[in-house]
Design a protein with these regions (language model features):
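Generic structural marker for isolated residues within well-ordered, non-membrane alpha-helices
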Residues: 90, 335, 388, 438-439
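C-terminal amphipathic alpha-helical
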Residues: 100-119, 266-275, 320-421, 431
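Extended, charged amphipathic alpha-helical segments
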Residues: 209-364, 411
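Charge-rich, acidic-biased intrinsically disordered regions
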Residues: 126-134, 281-299, 357, 389-419, ...
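Charged, long alpha-helical assembly modules
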Residues: 318, 330, 337, 422-425, ...
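Extended, helix-rich architectural segments
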Residues: 1-161, 496, 506-508, 515-518
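Extended, regular secondary-structure scaffolds
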Residues: 117-244
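Activation/maturation switch segments at domain boundaries
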Residues: 313, 426-518
């Protein structure tokens, strides 16, 4: 029994959905590996027979997928939380899971094969027979990347895949097993994960129902998906209403062929640029002394002439000037066209005769690369957001973490696209001119949510009083000082008046005393 047959019988899976695009997926896998048998294997006729050749390749499908993954996600990207404690716990969790690497691989694989997925799970949970969780103190979260071959959509709409089955292969003591997890919504609109284990005998699967250590039915008690299906935000022009995506180069296959033909021609120009020898057919006979052939019949630089030529035509040779300059120019022209087709714009790739280089300069915000990057971020944002939410929920509900994902924000890295310092200066000017608020400034420059931005501004204003407040305090201090001075002046005046009165009374007493003596 095949896994598709099992899913069809038990979960009403429709195999036609994947069968329709399977041929393209196999083609994309070949290009991603850099070896398309129908293209990279060819023959050259040497005058006697066809000699098998293998075309040199620049493996641009891998290069394109890697470059887009690096542009979209790097260590400069930020995942931020409003609560400081949640941020600290999440930073610890992503280190344990190596989450940034998982996201980067998912972006590359989806860009290379059109679709890939991440699946979140937990293990080392102690559970009783009734399905109650007894101990989660040792529970660990795990995130697996699933290739398109093992993705089986069950329910989807124009926006997303809502129910899906995933397969994976594991070997135990040399025995091959297939593990299948099915994510479905129950009547309460909460996800339940059904796990199945199969023993694989040369492609024939037999389910193992008594396996210990695996929860056959795992209720998540949440509507958060424990899987994320990554697809580039490119319209699937091969199949309408398909849940599968297409790679970055899906509509540039002919351009990749042109690049490899040019590269192969350049390599052969150098390899075959030595003297080419034309030999009459009877010269290919065995040497009488050694019984070995005089010329190697597999050598493409030796061309066998038909018999009947004159004695002077037994062996001839020619040597031409190498045309490497023209070959390199042609190769770079094809690289420019390919780069433009896959969204990088012109001059993204350049071959200098030895190595392939990639443009690293900061590009204009109006460039094709910038616009394609922003478009892809729109689609990948929700995929990454759902992955993070599932990881945080699993670690909180079935582990020892406590992470609040409310108002969580993801900030992509735009340092290669735009000058952040210049953007900050421009945004500051807009704040001073009243064109945008301080909260809008923080949202744009720091990638914060509106709530987080307002909270940060409040904290800053509390720690740093405004100019008006400082002036008001200064006025209050001045008024207080003036009042104190006035009171002091009044007191001094009172004391002076009192002294003057005493002196006046004293003089009067002395005068009365003198009159009495007389």
């Amino acid at each position: 029994m095949k896994l598709e047959e099992f899913l069809q019988q038990k979960y009403n899976y429709n195999p036609e959905i994947k069968d329709a695009i399977k041929g393209y997926i196999e083609q994309w896998k070949s290009w991603y590996k850099g070896n398309v048998r129908s293209f990279h294997n060819y023959f050259i006729y040497n005058g006697n027979k066809k000699v098998k050749q293998h075309r040199y390749t620049m493996n641009m499908a891998k290069e394109i997928s890697e470059d887009w993954s690096d542009i979209l996600w790097s260590e400069k990207c930020e995942i931020s939380f409003v609560k400081e404690d949640s941020q600290k716990q999440f930073d610890k969790l992503i280190d344990e899971l190596d989450l940034y690497s998982i996201i980067n691989r998912a972006l590359e694989k989806s860009g290379a094969l059109g679709t890939t997925a991440t699946v979140t799970s937990v293990y080392d949970i102690l559970q009783n027979e009734d399905g109650m969780y007894l101990d989660v103190s040792q529970a660990k979260v795990r995130v697996d990347t699933v290739d398109v071959d093992w993705i089986y959509p069950l329910s989807w709409n124009n926006k997303e895949i809502t129910e899906c089955a995933f397969g994976s292969v594991e070997y135990v003591n040399g025995v091959k097993y297939v593990i299948c997890s099915v994510h479905r919504l129950n009547e309460q609109n909460e996800y339940v994960i059904y796990n199945h284990l199969f023993k694989d005998s040369n492609g024939n699967l037999s389910e193992i129902t008594e396996e210990q250590g695996t929860m056959k039915e795992f209720p998540t008690h949440s509507n958060i998906k424990w899987f994320s299906v990554f697809k580039p935000l490119l319209t699937n022009n091969l199949f309408n209403n398909s849940p599968f995506g297409i790679p970055h180069y899906a509509n540039a296959i002919d351009n990749m062929k042109a690049v490899d033909i040019s590269f192969d021609a350049l390599k052969n120009e150098i390899k075959d640029g030595r003297k080419r020898t034309f030999v009459r057919s009877d010269m290919f006979n065995y040497d009488n002394g050694t019984q070995k052939m005089v010329f190697d019949p597999e050598d493409t630089t030796v061309y066998q002439l038909p018999s009947g030529a004159t004695k002077d035509d037994l062996i001839q040779s020619d040597s031409d000037v190498l045309r490497t300059t023209q070959q390199i120019e042609t190769l770079n022209t094809n690289l420019n066209i390919l780069g433009s087709k896959v969204g990088f714009g012109e001059n993204h790739y350049h071959f200098d005769g030895t190595n392939l280089s990639t443009a690293t300069a900061v590009v204009s915000s109006n460039s094709k690369l910038f616009r394609r990057k922003k478009k892809l971020e729109i689609g990948y944002y929700n995929d990454i957001l759902n992955l993070i939410k599932s990881v945080c929920y699993a670690a909180t509900q079935f582990g020892t973490y406590n992470i609040d994902t409310t108002d969580m924000a993801i900030q992509f890295d735009d340092s290669i696209i735009e000058d952040k310092e210049a953007e900050s200066v421009r945004a500051s000017r807009e704040v001073s001119q009243g064109l945008i608020s301080k909260a809008e400034y923080r949202e744009r420059i720091f990638g914060e949510t509106e709530e987080a931005a307002k909270k940060a501004i409040e904290e800053i204003e509390e720690a740093t009083p405004s100019v008006d407040k400082l002036l008001n305090n200064a006025d209050s201090n001045d008024n207080s000082s003036n009042t104190d001075n006035k009171d002091e002046e009044n007191n001094n005046k009172g004391e002076k008046d009192k002294d003057n009165k005493n002196d006046k009374n004293k003089k009067k007493d002395n005068k009365n005393k003198d009159l009495k003596e007389e």
